[in-house]
């Protein structure tokens, strides 16, 4: 059995066949000798092909086929995993877009609410300022009226005093 796997054996067999062919050609003197040597060479060749087929080509073909099947299986599995990963990536991107859109909507709503509150506070501040201005104006008007009333009374008193003085000076002169 070890003899079948010995690479030197096959080379030795070929060398023997070549020697026999050379000897046969030398004896016959022609290019082709259709005698027993040619038949023996054909038998040797067919025997060698059968042995190589049984020992090397069959197992090698089987290993190559198994490897091809393994590669096809892994390629299919890899394609499925790639498709799953792509689907997950697409789903992630869709969720990310949705989340960003929701975040933009929340930000827009918060900005609108802040603008509304700002407008309300500004309106309230303006109303309070108008009330204070109106109150201050009313207080100034009251103080003005009080000052005018006080001055009016004083002017009347001064006018009377001045009139009396002028009348008394006029009366003394006449």
UniProtKB/Swiss-Prot annotation:
Keywords: ATP synthesis, Cell inner membrane, Cell membrane, CF(0), Hydrogen ion transport, Ion transport, Membrane, Transmembrane, Transmembrane helix, Transport. It is a single-pass membrane protein. InterPro entries: ATP_synth_b, ATP_synth_B-like_membr_sf, ATP_synth_b/b'su_bac/chlpt, ATP_synth_F0_bsu_bac, ATP_synthase_B_chain. It comes from the Bacteria. The keyword Ion transport applies. One of its GO terms (molecular function) is proton-transporting ATP synthase activity, rotational mechanism. The chain crosses the membrane at residues 38-58. It is found in: Cell inner membrane. SUPFAM superfamilies: F1F0 ATP synthase subunit B, membrane domain. CDD domains: ATP-synt_Fo_b. GO terms for cellular component: plasma membrane; proton-transporting ATP synthase complex. Belongs to the ATPase B chain family. F-type ATPases have 2 components, F(1) - the catalytic core - and F(0) - the membrane proton channel. F(1) has five subunits: alpha(3), beta(3), gamma(1), delta(1), epsilon(1). F(0) has four main subunits: a(1), b(1), b'(1) and c(10-14). The alpha and beta chains form an alternating ring which encloses part of the gamma chain. F(1) is attached to F(0) by a central stalk formed by the gamma and epsilon chains, while a peripheral stalk is formed by the delta, b and b' chains. HAMAP family: ATP_synth_b_bprime (MF_01398), ATP_synth_bprime (MF_01399). PANTHER family: ATP SYNTHASE SUBUNIT B', CHLOROPLASTIC. F(1)F(0) ATP synthase produces ATP from ADP in the presence of a proton or sodium gradient. F-type ATPases consist of two structural domains, F(1) containing the extramembraneous catalytic core and F(0) containing the membrane proton channel, linked together by a central stalk and a peripheral stalk. During catalysis, ATP synthesis in the catalytic domain of F(1) is coupled via a rotary mechanism of the central stalk subunits to proton translocation. This is ATP synthase subunit b'. It comes from Gloeobacter violaceus (strain ATCC 29082 / PCC 7421).
